Amino acid sequence: MVFRIASSPYTHNQRQTSRIMLLVLIAALPGIAAQTWFFGWGTLFQIVLAAITALVAEAIVLRLRKQSVASHLQDYSALLTGLLLAVSIPPLAPWWMVVLGTGFAIIIAKQLYGGLGQNPFNPAMIGYVVLLISFPVQMTSWLPPYEIAATTPDILDTLRMIFSGHTASGGDMTLLRIGIDGISQATPLDTFKTSLRAGHSVEQIMQYPIYSGALAGVGWQWVNLAWLVGGVFLLWQKAIRWHIPVSFLLTLALCAALGWLFSPATLASPQLHLLSGATMLGAFFILTDPVTASTTNRGRLIFGALAGVLVWLIRSFGGYPDGVAFAVLLANITVPLIDYYTRPRVYGHRKG
């Protein structure tokens, strides 16, 4: 009798993987719709560009590795990576940026490590950080939500901006970022950080148009609530577990509340942290990546809490206004250590 010995993983269920990935793609629809509503058609165009790039890059690498292209593409993981990167970048970012970032995410951050299940870092966030460090101006050039925008590009001008950098009338990103008050706009978190550095008080900052009549910034609170709806859907479908998003959001809220309590003149409120930036997207769609997150329940709680602390620290004291991507990657580094100390011991073995 011949015994065949194979390396791990010892169980394979591609159908289950593709089902979970498909559920995540479906759950992303409310967030995509909200971002498109408030920031224009560019969100959809970036998603299409990222999806095409992800599929092509994955297919090329699989062909070079002499693996089945069709079966691997049907797990939807490449599409999800492209989607997460596309919704994280400004909707009018140049086309080559999303292509570069997605290609880097798939080829370097995923396939170079061996493909799905082998990568230690979240590929989409690796691609995002590479773009943010390399092209900080373009990666922070978000349009103001349509409610406070002085100029809103139509679908054709959106395409022109992405592929040429100008509208039909010759307008550029500088013009499109002008708000109704005649001042160039930024995201709520970016506005808060840069205004504090300029010596403005929190009370003055909250009078800016980007915060008018909103808990956490015009448009952004609804975008985050839309991603929250998608996250609840994933929990309902048991596609993700509650431990990471709950511990992440509770820790972020606790840190923000304590900071705001002791220094309300210099630190953002809990609602600004929870409902601005990529908070809900990170909580339910990025941190919960089963490949790069902790694999035990206690470990997931620690992993989520660590990410929450890191997001608050980066937003409050770091050089970047959001910090979700950096927090995710830093938390990914700790996963082997977290799993080592939280994995249940084998029955019959003493603690060593």
From Swiss-Prot:
It is a multi-pass membrane protein. The chain crosses the membrane at residues 20-40, 42-62, 69-91, 123-143, 215-235, 242-262, 267-287, 301-321, 322-342. The modification FMN phosphoryl threonine is found at T187. Its cofactor is FMN. Keywords: Cell inner membrane, Cell membrane, Electron transport, Flavoprotein, FMN, Membrane, Phosphoprotein, Translocase, Transmembrane, Transmembrane helix, Transport. Its EC number is 7.-.-.-. GO terms for biological process: electron transport chain; transmembrane transport. It comes from the Bacteria. InterPro entries: NqrB/RnfD, RnfD_bac. One of its GO terms (cellular component) is plasma membrane. It is found in: Cell inner membrane. HAMAP family: RsxD_RnfD. Belongs to the NqrB/RnfD family. Part of a membrane-bound complex that couples electron transfer with translocation of ions across the membrane. Required to maintain the reduced state of SoxR. The complex is composed of six subunits: RsxA, RsxB, RsxC, RsxD, RsxE and RsxG. This is Ion-translocating oxidoreductase complex subunit D. It comes from Salmonella typhi.
